[in-house]
UniProtKB/Swiss-Prot annotation:
ARM repeats lie at residues 89-131, 170-211, 347-390, 391-431, 479-519. It is linked to Alfadhel syndrome: An autosomal recessive neurodevelopmental disorder characterized by global developmental delay and regression, intellectual disability, hypotonia, delayed motor development, stereotypy, behavioral abnormalities, and dysmorphic features. The modification N6-acetyllysine is found at residue 230. Residues 239-255 are annotated as: Interacts with polybasic regions in GTPases. SUPFAM superfamilies: ARM repeat. A motif (Nuclear export signal (NES)) lies at residues 4-13. It comes from the Eukaryota. Interacts with RABL3. Interacts with RHOT1. This is Rap1 GTPase-GDP dissociation stimulator 1. InterPro entries: ARM-like, ARM-type_fold, Armadillo, RAP1GDS1. Keywords: Acetylation, Chromosomal rearrangement, Cytoplasm, Endoplasmic reticulum, Guanine-nucleotide releasing factor, Intellectual disability, Mitochondrion, Nucleus, Repeat. The keyword Nucleus applies. One of its GO terms (molecular function) is guanyl-nucleotide exchange factor activity. The lineage of its organism: Eukaryota, Metazoa, Chordata, Craniata, Vertebrata.
């Protein structure tokens, strides 16, 4: 290291008078010292102040520019050297060298800029201001088709430089996308897929860019799907496959790309992985099984890709996914149930699946997870059942198959996601099914649990669904017994609160249920309706100009129904409802105006 100090002193003199031979010798000594101990040598270079002199050795005329760029690339491997390189004014001359025709100069310059940009805001900013990215992209475009090893090495360095330049920086990534880097990288991948280093660089770049929403459209207009699937089929190493997965997952969020991936044969690859890995207990295989099956489910989120794979219920992919549900592997059970939930996004698919025995498979799966079961599997299976119950024709079939009994086993669950799906499934099943609604509405355990969940302030979804199911039990059963059960369990106050919801659909469901209560069991419910301040709430809803027409209409229907109760009648009189109602006679909505006239007559007669 002593002769390093001599070299640095000598270099200071020769850098100024540019004595070529001794200059080359000094630079060779520096490179040698860096190869032996990079950190220590870099510290000495920084302390010597020589960095400032390097700018003058990076001119296009300089014969040693490649060596100087190489030295900068080596010192910039150290984090502490990156800002000093920027401060020494090296970025602008380095970017100028990107216009060189000499391959070695381009290689070392690309390395130097890439290392200076690595994890360095200052480095990136300086390269951005000097316009370095556009020149590199132009090089990638023009050199793209040349496949000799030296050129591939240069392409790899340039890709790496762009990656370091834009990594985790949305605005610089967006800049590269606007410069058209995506089609160029996809082309590179296609031509150089035999070159492992370059392929890897392209994949990492895709992984970075694919997270940006603006990139998806550009990716969709290339043949990225085809190239990635082709590459995937060739890979046997877990790490390489994992790398491709990391690009596929964000890309597959785009519906157009989902379809392209399906058409390129990705699904067949994924099914093969599942088959190979399902019985393995190796950590890598378990990870790959999860990633593969998750990606499969993601592909089914696109309507076109999902229908293509369903193939009218005859598709081999659909059949394979069905076979996952009875498997003993939790990950496959989960993916299978989620896939069914995705296939069940239109009525025709739902009807076909119910007719072909899917409900029994899902109920068997739920049965295996009742005691200390897997929450994600429970949630997925319930999601599938909920979706399957949407078509009217399926409801009676699912009820007679015993779905309500299977679902009710999860009433004791303390997991909000499971509670939420359980409630949604029951609500779908009883829609317009009077007998089922009555049976469930008289189930004291269920109603008490619903009332408890109506107070789940930490879980708005569960709270909302519980309220909606309470209301649905009354609306679809129109049963006095159901109303009595709900009154006895303390459910009335929740229905009254629901009438003030910010969601019109929920307000309306509450008002219709309350009108049925008032018509069928007013005597039983009047105390609860009074203490829940229903009359005051109705006055507020009618007086509020923002209330939707159907809310005003149903509020007036309810007011008329409440007149049969002495205490509620008195409250109506005390609140001067006539003023509010008479104003609504001129409402632009005909139904509201008519109901206002009827309500006004009723109030006048009863006063």
């Amino acid at each position: 290291m002593d002769n390093l100090s001599d070299t640095l002193k000598k270099l200071k003199i020769t850098a100024v008078d540019k004595t070529e031979d001794s200059l080359e010798g000094c630079l060779d000594c520096l490179l040698q010292a860096l190869a032996q101990n990079n950190t220590e040598t870099s510290e000495k270079i920084q302390a010597s102040g020589i960095l400032q002199l390097f700018a003058s050795l990076l001119t296009p005329q300089s014969s040693c520019k490649a060596k100087v760029a190489n030295i900068i690339a080596e010192v910039a491997k150290n984090e502490f050297m990156r800002i000093p390189c920027v401060d020494a004014g090296l970025i602008s001359p380095l970017v100028q060298l990107l216009n060189s025709k000499d391959q070695e100069v381009l290689l070392q310059t690309g390395r130097a800029l890439g290392n200076i940009c690595y994890d360095s805001h200052e480095g990136r900013s300086a390269v951005d201001q000097a316009g370095g990215a556009q020149i590199v992209i132009d090089h990638l475009r023009s050199l793209c088709s040349i496949t000799d090893p030296a050129n591939e090495k240069l392409l790899t360095v340039f890709c790496g430089m762009l990656m370091n330049y834009s990594n985790e920086n949305d605005s610089l990534q967006a800049q590269l996308i606007n410069m058209g880097v995506i089609p160029t990288l996809v082309k590179l991948l296609g031509i150089h897929c035999q070159n492992a280093a370059l392929t890897e660089m392209c994949l990492v770049a895709f992984g970075n860019l694919a997270e940006l929403e603006s990139s998806k459209e550009q990716f969709a207009s290339t043949n990225i799907a085809e190239e990635l699937v082709k590459l995937f089929k060739k890979q046997i190493e877990h790490d390489k496959r994992e790398m491709i997965f990391e690009v596929l997952a964000p890309l597959a969020e785009n519906d157009a790309i989902k379809l392209q991936l399906v058409e390129a044969g990705l699904v067949e690859c994924l099914l093969e992985i599942v088959q190979q890995k399902v019985d393995s207990d190796k950590e890598d295989d378990i990870t790959e099984l999860k990633t593969g099956s998750d990606l499969m489910v993601l592909l089914l989120l696109g309507d076109e890709s999902m229908q293509k794979l369903f193939e009218g219920g005859k598709g081999s992919v659909f059949q394979r996914v069905l076979s996952w549900i009875p498997s003993n592997n939790h990950q496959l059970q989960l993916a299978g149930a989620l896939a069914i939930a995705n296939f069940a996004r239109n009525d025709a698919n739902c009807i076909h699946m119910v007719d072909n025995g899917i409900v029994e498979k899902l109920m068997d799966l739920l049965d295996r997870h009742v005691e200390d079961g897997n929450v994600t599997v429970q949630h997925a299976a319930l999601s599938a059942l909920r979706n399957l119950a949407i078509p009217v024709i399926n409801k009676a079939k699912m009820l007679s198959a015993g779905v309500t009994e299977a679902v009710l086993k999860f009433l004791k669950s303390e997991m909000p996601p499971v509670q939420f799906k359980l409630l949604g499934t029951l609500r779908m099943l009883i829609d317009a099914q009077a007998e089922a609604a009555e049976q469930l509405g008289k189930n004291v355990k269920l109603v008490e649990r619903l009332v408890e969940w109506c107070e789940a302030k930490d879980h708005a979804g569960v709270m909302g669904e519980s309220n909606r199911l309470l209301s649905a039990l009354i609306r679809h059963s129109k049963s006095k017994d159901v109303i009595k059960t709900i009154v006895q369990s303390g459910g009335i106050k929740h229905l009254v609160t629901m009438a003030t919801s910010e969601h019109v659909i929920m307000q309306n469901e509450a008002l219709v249920a309350l009108a049925l209560i008032a018509a069928l069991e007013l005597g039983t419910a009047e105390k609860d309706l009074e203490s829940a301040k229903l009359v005051q709430i109705l006055h507020r809803l009618l007086a509020d100009e923002r209330s939707a027409p159907e809310i005003k209409y149903n509020s007036m229907v309810l007011i008329c129904a409440l007149m049969g109760s002495e205490c509620l009648h008195k409250e109506v009189q005390d609140l001067a409802f006539l003023d509010v109602v008479s104003k609504l006679r001129s409402h632009e909505n005909k139904s509201v105006a008519q109901q206002a006239s009827l309500t006004e007559q009723r109030l006048t007669v009863e006063s």
